[in-house]
A protein has these predicted regions:
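Acetyl-CoA-dependent GNAT
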Residues: 81-87, 107
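Terminal substrate-recognition subdomain of acyl/acetyltransferases
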Residues: 1-49, 54-57, 144-218
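A short helix-loop-beta-strand connector motif used in the catalytic cores of GNAT acetyltransferases and
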Residues: 55-67, 88-89
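Acyl-donor binding region in acyl/amide transferases
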Residues: 91-170, 174-177, 181-185
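Short connector loops at helix/strand junctions that flank enzyme active sites
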Residues: 60-63, 76, 108-110
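Conserved beta-strand in the GNAT
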Residues: 67, 73-83
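Short, flexible loop/turn elements at secondary-structure junctions
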Residues: 70, 83-85, 119, 191
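A broad, low-specificity signal marking well-ordered, structured residues that form hydrophobic/aromatic
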Residues: 11, 66, 79, 113, ...
Length: 218
């Protein structure tokens, strides 16, 4: 599956199926180590790609996955949002040994969404911040439609600073750990915490085909 969501003169954004997951995971891992570490061996990186790919397959049935491609059909960005069933172990369990449900006041209306595999290429001559905002908006869109939607994520510490400056109010659950070559922090945000970011940048995706994609994935 590959459905066009948005198109401009620099790139196209698609909603894609699980057949793209391996390429997405490889892109994310490669970009992370390109930014943060030059000391990992090829074997170590390949093993991480394999492990993360298998993890992503376990999320695929209730995930919405987005990729951005340039005019040469090269991946330049991606993100995945997963509606969590509270049974499958998330990265936050495995990396930090914590259960986010111990920190969130759950009600019968609560729904939980894990955002991950978020990366934008460092080798593009476009406004990466605009692509960054669009991809993040696609990910939080279904969360914000819920009565009591919660975002759960593990975010690079520098990226988290940018997200917070852009208006997202996140709650840190634990101090950072090294993951994929950088300090990574476990966070969550409720609907109120997402509100400022959502309303500031909803105009970025108003003309996109996001509603159709959301309805299909619900």
């Amino acid at each position: 599956m590959k459905n066009l969501i948005s198109k401009n003169e620099n790139y196209c954004i698609y909603s894609v199926g699980k057949e793209y997951l391996y390429d997405i995971v490889k892109f994310v891992v490669d970009e992370n180590y390109k930014h943060h570490s030059k000391f990992e061996t090829v074997n170590n990186i390949n093993e991480e790609i394999k492990t993360i790919y298998e993890e992503e397959l376990s999320f695929a049935e209730t995930s919405q996955i987005y990729i951005a491609e340039d005019s040469f059909q090269r991946m330049i960005g991606c993100i995945r949002v997963y509606k969590w069933d509270k049974k499958v172990l998330l990265p936050i369990h495995k990396i930090f040994n914590i259960n986010p449900l111990n920190y969130i006041k759950e009600t019968k209306n609560s729904s939980f969404w894990h955002i991950g595999r978020f990366a934008v290429s460092s080798n593009v001559e476009i406004s990466t911040i605009r692509l960054f905002k669009k991809l993040m908006m696609y990910a939080i869109f279904p969360i914000y439609q819920e009565k009591e939607g919660y975002m759960i994520a593990e975010i690079d510490s520098k990226l988290l600073q940018i997200i917070n400056r852009l208006g997202m109010d996140t709650v840190c659950l634990k101090s950072g750990e090294c993951y994929l070559g950088s300090e990574t922090i476990p966070v969550y945000a409720d609907k109120e915490g997402l509100s400022k970011f959502y309303h500031s940048y909803i105009s970025e995706i108003l003309l996109d085909n996001i509603n159709q994609c959301y309805i299909k994935a619900a």
